């Protein structure tokens, strides 16, 4: 029995709700999708709950689930994945945080949680932080540049804990929070103290940085604080190949996703021009996926643009992103051949552009196979048509479904 290559494409934040600017259509309905539409005659579609019905997924927990790992078992926090994706090498016991470069006033009240989002000087600021803040109370501190305004911070040393609260207030106009222990342990108390010292030191370094002085002169907001959240002890994940028997690779520019995929043992590629934003290089991502499909059984292609547009409320940009993803799918199919692979296209969660945050709605999912199946006889792929389809799955079902339809699944029982 022929075994097929597997291509899993996740458009981050793909799903949506009816949008007033689109006369009640969703971006997926409004988008022109000829390549996707052409696959429908040999596809099943439906809805996926990334975690379970009504649960609002993070991109971290949803991707763990999609890769076949129960987040209730394997999830300890996002910080470690962000750090791995940003290039950190973690050891057992390290505590990692995800964070944002942000703008605060002299009273540490947040003016902009993203320091304008675009931060071309990010690498220089990280270098300056690493040069000037190396250790606090015998705990080593290391900073890593993430995507756009994002940053990862790793604490290494004895007697530290991930049971501490965030310093990120999550809203502008509020003061940077004091980190507090989340359990009554010496390790948690000590770690919270270190984080609070770190917050002040980071502000002192960044607020006096010549880089930020130039940003102010140029009319830009200074990136003069790091807001921390998602503390996580490093816990090793099982390799993807150990439970799928697949040689796997991934294409992504987003630190979190790169971190998860690397930890799963996938070969992770970030092609030139791939940004993890709405300005990403779609052609480069398509070409990278095509090359990886030649050498791997499974290729995961992650595109962040749909989610970035949603969080900023950019309706037209989300529609354009979906149309560009459609062209990516068309280019891959044309190159690899529709008879040589199965393809799943979905999102990791719903991010409605009018809400600008994740919701617990089910996500539309499409599964194309290159051989005769009972298709769902729908005319389009969108949130409404998906409700007519045969698939009603959880994120945890995705990997098993892909193994089954690629003729790679093993029998359960005798």
Curated annotation (Swiss-Prot):
Pathway: Carbohydrate degradation; glycolysis; pyruvate from D-glyceraldehyde 3-phosphate: step 3/5
Catalysed reaction equations from the record: (2R)-2-phosphoglycerate = (2R)-3-phosphoglycerate
Gene Ontology BP term (one): glycolytic process
Isomerase in keyword set: yes
SUPFAM superfamilies in UniProt: Alkaline phosphatase-like
Family annotation (Pfam families): Metalloenzyme, PhosphMutase
GO molecular function: metal ion binding; phosphoglycerate mutase activity
Main EC class the enzyme belongs to: isomerase
Disulfide bond entries: none
InterPro entries referenced in this protein's UniProt entry, alphabetically: Alkaline_phosphatase_core_sf, ApgAM_prokaryotes, Metalloenzyme, Pglycerate_mutase_ApgM
UniProt keywords, alphabetically: Glycolysis, Isomerase
Record EC number: 5.4.2.12
Keyword hit for Isomerase: yes
Family: Belongs to the BPG-independent phosphoglycerate mutase family. A-PGAM subfamily.
Function field: Catalyzes the interconversion of 2-phosphoglycerate and 3-phosphoglycerate.
Protein name: 2,3-bisphosphoglycerate-independent phosphoglycerate mutase
Native source species: Saccharolobus solfataricus (strain ATCC 35092 / DSM 1617 / JCM 11322 / P2) (Sulfolobus solfataricus)
């Amino acid at each position: 029995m022929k075994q097929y290559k597997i291509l899993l494409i996740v458009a981050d934040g793909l799903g949506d709700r009816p949008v007033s600017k689109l006369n009640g259509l969703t971006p997926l309905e409004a988008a022109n999708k000829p390549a996707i539409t052409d696959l429908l005659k040999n596809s099943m579609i439906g809805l996926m709950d990334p975690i379970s019905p009504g649960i609002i997924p993070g991109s971290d927990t949803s991707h763990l689930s999609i890769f076949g790992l129960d987040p209730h078992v394997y999830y300890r926090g996002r910080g470690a994945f962000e750090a791995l994706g940003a290039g950190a090498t973690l050891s057992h016991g390290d505590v990692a945080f995800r964070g944002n470069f942000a703008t605060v006033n002299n009273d540490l009240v947040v003016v902009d949680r993203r320091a304008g989002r675009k931060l071309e000087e990010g690498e220089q600021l990280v270098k300056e932080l690493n040069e000037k803040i190396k250790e606090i109370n015998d705990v080593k501190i290391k900073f890593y540049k993430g995507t756009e305004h994002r940053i990862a911070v790793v604490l290494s040393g004895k007697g530290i804990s991930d049971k501490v609260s965030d310093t990120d207030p999550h809203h502008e106009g509020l003061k940077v929070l004091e980190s507090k222990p989340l359990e009554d342990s010496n390790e948690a108390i000590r770690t919270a103290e270190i984080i609070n010292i770190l917050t002040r030191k980071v502000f002192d370094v960044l607020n006096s940085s010549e880089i930020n002085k130039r940003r102010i002169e140029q009319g830009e907001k200074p990136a003069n604080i790091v807001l921390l959240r998602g503390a996580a002890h490093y816990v090793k994940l099982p390799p993807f190949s150990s439970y799928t028997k697949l040689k796997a690779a991934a294409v992504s520019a987003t630190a979190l996703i790169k971190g998860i995929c690397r930890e799963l043992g996938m070969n992770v590629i970030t092609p030139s021009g791939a940004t993890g934003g709405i300005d990403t290089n779609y052609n480069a991502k398509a070409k990278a996926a095509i090359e990886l499909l030649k050498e791997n059984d499974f290729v995961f292609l992650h595109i962040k643009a749909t989610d970035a547009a949603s969080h900023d409320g950019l309706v037209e940009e989300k529609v354009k992103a979906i149309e560009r993803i459609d062209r990516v799918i068309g280019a891959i199919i044309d190159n690899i051949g529709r008879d040589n692979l199965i393809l799943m296209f979905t999102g990791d969660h719903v991010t409605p552009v009018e809400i600008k945050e994740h919701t617990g709605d089910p996500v539309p999912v499409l599964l194309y196979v290159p051989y005769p199946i009972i298709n769902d006889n729908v005319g389009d792929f969108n949130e409404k048509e998906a409700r007519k389809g045969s698939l009603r799955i959880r994120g945890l079902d995705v990997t098993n479904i892909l193994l089954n339809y690629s003729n790679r699944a093993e029998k359960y029982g005798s």
